[in-house]
Curated annotation (Swiss-Prot):
Organism lineage string: Eukaryota, Metazoa, Chordata, Craniata, Vertebrata
CDD domains: DLP_1 (cd08771)
Oligomeric form and interacting partners: Oligomeric complex consisting of membrane-bound and soluble forms of OPA1.
Functional summary from the UniProt entry: Dynamin-related GTPase that is essential for normal mitochondrial morphology by mediating fusion of the mitochondrial inner membranes, regulating cristae morphology and maintaining respiratory chain function. Exists in two forms: the transmembrane, long form (Dynamin-like GTPase OPA1, long form; L-OPA1), which is tethered to the inner mitochondrial membrane, and the short soluble form (Dynamin-like GTPase OPA1, short form; S-OPA1), which results from proteolytic cleavage and localizes in the intermembrane space.
Protein known as: Dynamin-like GTPase OPA1, mitochondrial
Cellular component terms (Gene Ontology): cytoplasm; microtubule; mitochondrial inner membrane; mitochondrial intermembrane space; mitochondrial membrane
Mitochondrial matrix side stretches: 87-95
């Protein structure tokens, strides 16, 4: 007897396992396992084992569907199918639980591979530390101004990010539900039919799962996109806020610079105080064409003579850009040397310190100097007279101020400006002609003395040699190349060159390699002079060699010159200050001494007050001037292209149709543009009117150029709102579509508007006719005027055409050809030769006058026609369609003026005020613009007084500190 539980179990297994897990094949039944035969054959009452062999579908069972080889025991009970507990679910769970080991191993291996890949990529990236000099100075200080707490608060919360992650609880519930489906057991007939259903049900389940997965993925993508947009908007707002704060901080810094607000006072060294005075004097000299006589060390020499190398040895750092044979020093470089605990360099206008002990900082400093030099050179020039100020501090550095000048050249090569040689000579002379300047003359010892150019220049500027120090460079090459060592002795004794000097020095500034360090150059220099025959044979004295002795001698000479001349310079500036103050008191006794920046701030406030006055214009004034200007702009088009052509028709319906078509075309194409042009011109005129009215109230005329420039630039930048034209077109179209005049006052206003317009046109037409026919008999007798032959011909033509109009008062606007011929023949009969073109031209003006006179009579009749219009009576004499047309035009003008007034007061005036503020800010940051717009002797005198006072105060402070040091 077959067991029902086994049959049910097999059917359940076949339903759970897809068909692809086994390959169907046909085998004889007797070759199957006895249990398989029991499963694959239906139960029958007779237990006959003898059955004919037949083919049956069999499967290769996997480990998930393994069945016991021993036949299961039957339960106690009757016949039929019996439930049988199986352990296939437990086996399935055991197989699934093995996945955790696979996942854990994959995670560990994947993490290791990812880390290894990241390290490989990181090694392939270039070292960006060498390019830190590209980043501007303010970026390094940005971290001090950024509030990290605010940035952290602006980032998404952890809970919001967690919402975007997959819901693990839902995944667990789905897995439990799937497990329950797999573990459920079916009974009865439905269980037996299960093998026939699985393909369709499985397909439906798979499609449902895929659809659910697609929908969930789509929801996740939408959530991620929304979160990305929210984050983007949040950072955009942060960026806008930071830009606004940066702009405000920049404005505060500019105001501090302009108003002279100083930071906390820091005690400065003596040399720093002196260098600051020289910087102020340098600006004062370049702006006012004056020369100070304060001492400084001027380094001059031929190109590639070693000037820069000598200066670097004194500064103990390779701070200047180098080039093999080409010009590298393109502008004067003022170097303030002082002693300090750390070897650093800093520009005058920057707070960044360059650590001269680090090679990357040295490279950045050299690059910055080269950039500043190239920036100072104007287009089409090779060198610049602008000075670059640099301070160098370090242990063992002698205190002094040196100025490195461009090397003197003998020939202008390709790529240089034609006046390069003369410019270098003029710059060198400007520094050397200072009677207190110390000239450090650098001469290349490896070239012939006869090729020297700078020695002649120095001998011209200091013929007695009282402030010149001669330096012979590249002595090692000179000793090696020169056959006669006595020639070097003649140079350092001052016998070879036609110049005199306070002292003569011989130095070695390295082997010529740009990569040599200062220490290696010093060692090489000391070794050379210790082993040199020049020193051993007595040709050179010990105090005349090495850059160390040179720097000590130059420093002593510098400070000696400073002590002797600084008080004299202070007295000179004191006298200059007295002269300037006296001139101010005599010429401007009741005015405060305001420099250019202070005057600009005053003018800025006045201009902003004038702009604010625009908001005080009354709406009635805006609308009246807008309506008046708009009608002046469009009246010709309305009369000539709309009213006159439509009025020639004799039918009321044709008149209205023509008017509607022409009004629609006019509204779609021209009218909105004309209206915006009128509004823009009105805004400009009102702005100019307020500035002119404000000018009369004790305004300083020194601001006229500035105010005019601000007004022009603001108007140039102002653009009308683009959406205004579309809305205005709709409003105008709706206003012109309305034909219903509701009350008598509107009717009377339209008639008055029409009469004024027609009378104005009639007056213009009569003036044209009077010019055509010349003076009448009264003017000829009273004013002694005569008609020209053409005027006489036109007068005869006019008289003939007037007769025609009297006969045909309802004549059309154009003459027929036979009528032209008749008029011409009548005139010829009276001896007047006339051209047909002249006849038509005269007819046009006469008919125009005739038509306008008739229209005025009709307009007068329509004064009593409102009742007929309101009741829609049909009366040919009182068809006042032209009155309705003028009412539509008048109403459109009023509505347009009201709309434009709202746009002006609500939007455009504020936008114009914003433009004015931006223009004022831009002009305030442009010093050249301020110098160009605020000019005059009064401004110049105030600027001179401010500078001279500042120089005198700093000189007195320096002299006081100098006396204390003594």
């Amino acid at each position: 007897m077959l067991r029902a539980g086994s049959v049910v179990t097999c059917i359940a297994c076949k339903g759970l396992l897809p068909s692809r897990m086994g390959v169907k094949f046909r085998v004889p039944l007797q070759k199957l396992h006895p249990l398989s035969r029991a499963i694959h054959h239906r139960y029958s009452a007779n237990n006959n084992p003898q059955r004919p062999p037949h083919c049956s579908a069999a499967r290769h069972y996997t480990s998930l569907s393994r069945l016991p080889m021993r036949p299961p025991k039957s339960r106690s009970g009757g016949h039929g199918y019996q439930q049988h507990r199986t352990f296939w679910v437990a086996r399935l769970a055991a197989r699934l639980l093995k996945l955790r080991y696979i996942l854990l191993g994959s995670a560990v291996g994947g993490g290791y591979t990812a880390k290894k890949t990241y390290d490989e990529w990181k090694e392939m990236l270039p070292d960006m530390s060498e390019y830190t000099w590209i980043v501007p100075d303010f970026v390094w200080e940005l971290s001090e101004n950024i509030d990290l707490d605010k940035l952290a608060s602006a980032l998404p919360e952890l809970e919001e990010i967690a919402k975007l992650l997959p819901d693990m609880e839902k995944i667990g519930e789905n897995f439990t539900f799937l497990k329950s489906l797999l573990s459920s057991e079916t009974t009865g007939e439905s269980a037996l039919r299960a093998p026939d259903v699985p393909p369709a049900s499985a397909a439906m389940a798979d499609s449902g799962d895929k659809q659910f997965k697609k929908s969930s993925d789509k929801e996740k993508v939408d959530q991620l996109q929304e979160e990305l947009l929210r984050t983007q908007l949040k950072y955009q707002r942060m960026l806008e806020r930071l830009e606004k704060e940066n702009k405000e901080l920049r404005k505060v810094v500019l105001q501090k610079d302009d108003k002279g607000i100083h930071q906390r006072k820091v005690k400065k060294s003596l040399i720093d105080m002196y260098s600051e005075v020289l910087d102020i004097l340098s600006d004062y000299d370049s702006n006012y064409n004056t020369q100070d006589h304060l001492p400084r060390v001027v380094v001059v020499g031929d190109q590639s003579a070693g000037k820069t190398s000598v200066l670097e040895m004194i500064a103990q750092a390779r701070i200047f850009p180098r080039g093999s044979g080409e010009m590298m020093t393109r502008s004067p470089v003022k170097v303030t040397l002082s002693e300090g605990p750390h070897h650093v360099a800093m520009f005058k206008d920057s707070s960044r310190e360059f650590d001269l002990g680090k090679e990357e900082d040295l490279a950045a400093l050299r690059h910055e100097i080269e950039l500043r030099m190239r920036k100072s050179v104007k287009e089409g020039q090779t060198v610049s007279p602008e000075t670059i100020s640099l301070s160098v501090k370090g242990p063992g550095i002698q205190r002094m101020v040196l100025v490195d000048l461009p090397g003197v050249i003998s020939t202008v090569t390709t790529g240089m400006a034609a006046d390069t040689k003369e410019t270098i000579f003029s710059i060198s002379k400007a520094y050397m002609q200072n009677p207190n300047a110390i000239i450090l003359c650098i001469q290349d010892g490896s070239v012939d003395a006869e090729r020297s150019i700078v020695t002649d220049l120095v001998s011209q500027m200091d013929p007695q040699g009282k402030r010149t120090i001669f330096v012979l460079t590249k002595v090692d090459l000179a000793e090696k190349n020169l056959a006669s060592p006595s020639r070097i002795q003649q140079i350092v004794e001052g016998k070879l060159f036609p110049m005199k000097a306070l002292g003569y020095f011989a130095v070695v500034t390295g082997k010529g390699s740009p990569n040599e360090s200062i220490d290696s150059i010093k060692d090489y220099e000391e070794d050379f002079f210790q082993n040199s025959r020049l020193l051993k044979d007595g040709m050179l004295k010990a105090h005349q060699v090495t850059t160390k002795n040179l720097s000590l001698a130059v420093s002593d000479c510098f400070w000696k010159m400073v002590r002797e001349s600084v008080e004299q310079q202070a007295d000179a500036f004191k006298a200059s200050r007295f002269n300037l103050e006296t001139e101010w008191k005599n010429n401007y006794p009741r005015l405060r001494e305001l420099d250019r920046n202070e005057l600009y701030e005053k003018a800025k406030n006045e201009i902003l007050d004038e702009v604010i006055s625009l908001s005080q214009v009354t709406p009635k004034h805006w609308e009246s001037i807008l309506q008046k200007k708009l009608w002046e702009r469009v009246s010709t088009h309305v009369i000539e292209n709309i009213y006159l052509p439509a009025a020639q028709t004799m039918n009321s319906g044709t008149f209205n149709t023509t008017v509607d078509i022409k009004l629609k075309q006019w509204t779609d194409k021209q009218l909105p543009h004309k209206a915006l042009e009128v509004a823009w011109e009105t805004l400009q005129e009102e702005f100019a009117r307020f500035m002119a009215e404000y000018k009369g109230k004790d305004q300083d005329d020194i601001f006229d150029k500035l105010k005019e420039a601000v007004k022009d630039e603001s108007i140039k930048r102002h653009k009308w709102n683009e959406r205004a034209m579309d809305s205005l077109r709709v409003i105008q179209h709706n206003a012109l579509e309305d034909r219903s005049i509701t009350d008598k006052p509107q009717w009377d206003a339209a008639i008055q508007f029409m009469e004024e317009t027609l009378q104005s046109r009639l007056k213009d037409t009569e003036s044209v006719i009077a010019d055509m026919v010349g003076p009448d008999w009264k003017q000829r007798w009273m004013s002694w005027k005569n008609r020209t032959p053409e005027q006489h011909t036109r007068n005869e033509t006019k008289n003939e055409l007037e007769r025609l109009l009297k006969l045909h008062e309802d004549h059309t606007a154009y003459l027929a050809n036979d009528e032209v011929t008749t008029v011409r023949k009548n005139l010829e009969a009276r001896g007047v030769e006339v051209d047909p073109v002249l006849i038509k031209d005269t007819w046009h003006q006469l008919f125009r006058r005739h038509f306008l006179q008739k229209a005025l009579l009709h307009c007068n009749l329509c004064r009593r026609g409102f009742y007929y219009y309101q009741r829609h009576f049909v009366d040919s004499e009182l068809e006042c369609n032209d009155v309705v047309l003028f009412w539509r035009i008048q109403r459109m003008l009023g509505i347009t003026a009201n709309t434009l007034r709202q746009q002006l007061t609500n939007t455009e005036v504020r936008r114009l005020e914003k433009n004015v503020k931006e223009v004022l800010e831009d002009f305030g940051e442009d010093n050249e613009k301020k110098v160009q717009l605020i000019t005059g002797r009064r401004v110049q005198l105030a600027e001179d007084l401010k500078k001279v006072r500042e120089i005198q105060e700093k000189l007195e402070a320096f002299i006081e500190a100098l006396h204390k040091e003594k």
